C-alpha cells in the first residue's frame, strides 16, 4: 500500500503546496541576502524589524508539519476529511460518489483536482504519487493556477 502521508483525502498532493515547496526556500534566500547585507546589525533600529526577522527565521527554518490525515492541515472542520473517514475511504477519488458536491466546490479553486482524481483512478495511487513527485521537481504549486476562491459546502 502507498504511503499516503502527502495525499489529502480530497486528492491534493501536499508536496505541491507552496507552504511546503516554495515559501521556505524563498524565505531562506531572503534571510541569507539580508544577513549578507548586514540587516542583523542595523535592522533592529527599524520599528517592527525584530518581529519581522523572527517571523522570517521561522519561515526559513520551517519543516513540513502539516498532515491532512492527522487533522493538522486544512480547516479543522473539513467536511471532506470527516466524510472520507466516516466512509473508510483513503482518497475521495475511490469513492462511489466521486465527485460529490464538496469535491466539485473545492475543484473551483484547485483546477487540477478532478483530472488528478481521474488519473489516480486510472493508474492507481502508487503510480499517481510518483507522478506528483515528478511534478514537484518542476517547481509547480497549486497556487500557480488557482483561478477563483472556492467554498466547500459544510454538508
Regions found by a protein language model. Give the residues of each.
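Short flanking/linker segments adjacent to small metal-binding domains or redox-active Cys/His motifs
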Residues: 60-72, 129-155
Amino acid at each position: 500500500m502507498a504511503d499516503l502521508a502527502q495525499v489529502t483525502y480530497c486528492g491534493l498532493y501536499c508536496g505541491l503546496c507552496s507552504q511546503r515547496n516554495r515559501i521556505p526556500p524563498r524565505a531562506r534566500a531572503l534571510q541569507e541576502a539580508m544577513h549578507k547585507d548586514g540587516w542583523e546589525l542595523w535592522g533592529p533600529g527599524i520599528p517592527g524589524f525584530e518581529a519581522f526577522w523572527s517571523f522570517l527565521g521561522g519561515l526559513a527554518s520551517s519543516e513540513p508539519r502539516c498532515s491532512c490525515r492527522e487533522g493538522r492541515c486544512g480547516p479543522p472542520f473539513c467536511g471532506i476529511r470527516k466524510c472520507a473517514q466516516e466512509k473508510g475511504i483513503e482518497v475521495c477519488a475511490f469513492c462511489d460518489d466521486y465527485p460529490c458536491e464538496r469535491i466539485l466546490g473545492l475543484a473551483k479553486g484547485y483546477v487540477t483536482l478532478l483530472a488528478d482524481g481521474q488519473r489516480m483512478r486510472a493508474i492507481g495511487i502508487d503510480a499517481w504519487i510518483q507522478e506528483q513527485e515528478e511534478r514537484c521537481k518542476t517547481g509547480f504549486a497549486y497556487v500557480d493556477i488557482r483561478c477563483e476562491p472556492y467554498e466547500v459546502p459544510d454538508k
